[in-house]
Amino acid sequence: CACLVGSEMCIRDRCVALTGTSLSVCGAAMQGLLKNPLADGSTLGVSSGASLGAVISIAFGITLPGIPLAGTMSMAMLFAFLSLVVILGLAYRLDGSLSTGTIILIGVIYSMFVSSVLSLVITFAPDKVQSITFWTMGSLAGRGYVHVLVLLGALVVFGGVLFGCARELNAFAVGEDNARHIGVNVRRVKLTVMIAVSALIGVCVSVGGTIGFVGLVTPHMVRLITGPNHRRLLPASAFGGAIFLMLCDLLARTLFDPRELPVGVVTSFIGSILFVVIFIRTRRGEK
């Protein structure tokens, strides 16, 4: 029994570490791409779309036989992809250059729209409100090796793409026009980074629900140590994100033992405090 519990905890820890790594790398990449310190992997609205897919699966009992949470994961990833197509399509129609302001605006509007649809779905499944609420708060309890492999595969593929764009992300720091002048294909890099981030976020949301502030706070903390160079920032953010989420998950399990908190509640509570502290220190440094 002890071996079984230990094995389950080991699987959970791996899921937590991989999720924290993925969310933090996505946050660092989006902050560099959009030159916006408030950006993270959810800025595009894809995480909202993934949440909608998962909630629909839970509310209406969409499952795949033999694999736990497979229906929820499949629907979340499908809706993440559809959300990206919708957001980029609207942004391209409004602004063919896919400017940062347009992308952020479309992402915010889309997230608000999805939020209203989520509320509508919940009204049609009142008996599933508790399950939906717990899932949307974020939790990695009860995950298996299938989820570890899904997270690992997504991180290797899409995380590798983001690491490969480190030089181009450094160029974005001096502005899109200047990046274009030194030979960076701005539109291609934007699309590449946004697709990779969206895919990785979609997988994370499909496995663990909505876990906020990891991709927002961790890159800020790491940047204080490594500086803005993405060749150092991205790997350091990956390491920092894993540690941050593992600490938050430990608190979620033990703070009110035997009752377990959703890890997303802990990350939001700690992350919001850390973000305020970092923001104040940064503002003081600028003065």
Where is each model-derived feature located?
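Alpha-helical transmembrane segments in inner-membrane proteins
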Residues: S7-K287
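Positively charged, low-complexity/disordered segments
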Residues: A2-G6
